[in-house]
Amino acid sequence: MYSCITFFQRLERSILSGNKTATIRDKSDSHYLVGQMLDACTHEDNRKMCQIEILSIEYVTFSELNRAHANAEGLPFLFMLKWIVRKIYPTSNDLFFISFRVVTIDIL
């Protein structure tokens, strides 16, 4: 059985299409390992959407976030990424940039 990492449901299409290839998490949600296989589930209802493999984990501070991080998150602009990160993690400056690839897609 695989562990589950959750994403907001609105990100499902972007993940499954390969447009979103990374996620930014704080320390409390950074316990994953490179090479680990995870079920990617929706945050709202814990529905499995696909299986992913963790490719890399990079420690990054909020001020070090750049356009490459935004692009991997499927966002065109850095300011959008920083706004979203601040909404989710209002006080965290220590973050983890987790790159992944979709391995299998669950068809309903």
UniProtKB/Swiss-Prot annotation:
Family: Belongs to the N(4)-acetylcytidine amidohydrolase family.
Protein name (database record): N(4)-acetylcytidine amidohydrolase
Stored SUPFAM superfamilies: PUA domain-like (SSF88697)
EC number(s) stated in the UniProt entry for this protein: 3.5.1.135
Organism annotation: Moritella marina (Vibrio marinus)
Listed InterPro entries: AC4CH, ASCH_domain, PUA-like_sf
Matching Pfam families: ASCH
Catalytic machinery residues: K20 (proton acceptor), T23 (nucleophile), E73 (proton donor)
Reactions catalysed: N(4)-acetylcytidine + H2O = cytidine + acetate + H(+); N(4)-acetyl-2'-deoxycytidine + H2O = 2'-deoxycytidine + acetate + H(+); N(4)-acetylcytosine + H2O = cytosine + acetate + H(+)
Domain ASCH residues, every copy: 5-102
GO molecular function annotations of the record: hydrolase activity, acting on carbon-nitrogen (but not peptide) bonds, in linear amidines; N4-acetylcytidine amidohydrolase activity
Gene Ontology cellular component terms for the protein in this record: cytosol
Keywords, sorted A to Z: Hydrolase
Protein purpose: Catalyzes the hydrolysis of N(4)-acetylcytidine (ac4C).
